[in-house]
């Protein structure tokens, strides 16, 4: 009986872990689409900034110091209202989409 219960617990834990991994991957894909369509032109596919973006002074999203120093709230405000030469996106993206972009930007953080 103990072995059966142990096996069931292990199976249940594996299912939960598998679900979370799949969920994270699916979220990342959705976030990537929003980023690609709205941000990539200046911020680059790799988050380091395109030539155009660097000329405009965009941050390097792969910089751990920038990631540590920048809060989600600061990013939400910048995306919503614009910042320096970056146009505001609050009229174009929903609050949920803006939060998705912030989550995607966090994927660029060095591991």
Model feature map: region roles:
Residues 54-59, 77-109:
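Axial heme c-ligation environment in periplasmic c-type cytochrome domains
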Residues 8-18:
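Bacterial N-terminal signal peptides
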Residues 32-57, 83-85, 107-111:
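Periplasmic/extracellular electron-transfer cofactor-ligation site
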Residues 62-73:
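Short microdomains enriched in Cys/His and/or Lys/Arg
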Residues 31-35, 71, 75, 82, ...:
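Stable alpha-helical elements in mature extracytoplasmic
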Residues 16-34, 50:
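Electrostatic cytochrome c docking/interface patches
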């Amino acid at each position: 009986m103990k072995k059966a219960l142990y096996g069931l617990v292990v199976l249940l834990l594996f299912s939960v872990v598998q679900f979370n991994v799949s969920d994270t991957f699916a979220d990342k894909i959705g976030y990537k689409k929003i980023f690609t369509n709205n941000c990539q032109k200046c911020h680059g596919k790799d988050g380091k900034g395109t030539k155009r973006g660097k000329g405009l002074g965009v941050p390097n999203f792969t910089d751990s110091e920038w990631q540590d120093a920048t809060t989600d709230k600061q990013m939400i405000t910048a995306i919503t209202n614009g910042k320096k030469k970056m146009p505001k996106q609050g009229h174009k993206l929903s609050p949920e989409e803006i939060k998705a972009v912030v989550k995607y930007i966090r994927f660029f953080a060095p591991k």
